[in-house]
Amino acid sequence: MQRYAVGIEFSGIQYRGWQTQQPGVASVQETIERVLSKIADEPITLHGAGRTDAGVHATNMVAHFDTTAIRPERGWIMGANSQLPKDISIQWIKQMDEEFHARFKATARRYRYVVYNAPHRPALLHKQVTHIYQKLDVQKMIKAASKFEGTHNFETFRAAACQSNQPVRHVKHCRLFQHGRYLVLDIQADGFLHHMVRNIMGCLLEIGQGMYEIDHIDTMFAAEDRKAAGITAPPDGLYFIQCYYPEQFDLPQPPLGPHWLNLPE
């Protein structure tokens, strides 16, 4: 039995998220498993580094699978990409020791959330960004983003249906920057709760619209109640961009996305 790690890029528009759903419901995981199973001529199960909601995208989702099939790495990539739908692409594959696990060996994960802030919605970026037409106080949002850095109880900023046993997470960085008409939230943490990034982005958007002051974030944290925070931002602008592992695994490090924005690393 051989273990492979894979890096996957996908648009989440047509899928009900990463994780396999009930029969007849399209998911990214199930779509890739079906193709890899054909190539391997045996059932393949993918184990992803994380889960994404319906409509959320990824530029480097890491996963792994085990197989008895012997193929060169290039053969796996070319074979899979020739059969996968155009909105899913295998970017790299690497043979690994069985010690590697895409989820349990990950030390951190990183997301970017992209807002297009302009009077009119962008037709060519439909469901690839979140459009906000209201004028935003960007400098205020930038200052507010740093409030989420460090170790906190994120009970207020997770979905009511979140199944995680405990809500404490360490956020290494939470930075918001402006790139022309785009606002980009870049956040890295040891782990994320269900809807955590989208709820943080929703909070920042409300601050940018003047609905409350930056210090109100402290009140939200203290409440430890989802009802104390504001909106959940749409999934459209959210991208899973990187997963980090110990150096011993030496996984490929592709450029951070989304690539069409040509953002700084």
Swiss-Prot record:
Sites where the protein binds substrate: Y111
Top-level enzyme category: isomerase
Molecular function terms, GO-annotated: RNA binding; tRNA pseudouridine(38-40) synthase activity
Pfam families referenced in this protein's UniProt entry, alphabetically: PseudoU_synth_1
EC code: 5.4.99.12
Record's function text: Formation of pseudouridine at positions 38, 39 and 40 in the anticodon stem and loop of transfer RNAs.
The gene coding this protein: truA
InterPro entries recorded: PsdUridine_synth_cat_dom_sf (IPR020103), PsdUridine_synth_TruA (IPR001406), PsdUridine_synth_TruA_a/b_dom (IPR020097), PsdUridine_synth_TruA_C (IPR020095), TruA/RsuA/RluB/E/F_N (IPR020094)
Gene Ontology terms: biological process: tRNA pseudouridine synthesis
Protein name: tRNA pseudouridine synthase A
Keyword Signal: no
Matching HAMAP family: TruA (MF_00171)
The UniProt record lists the keyword Isomerase: yes
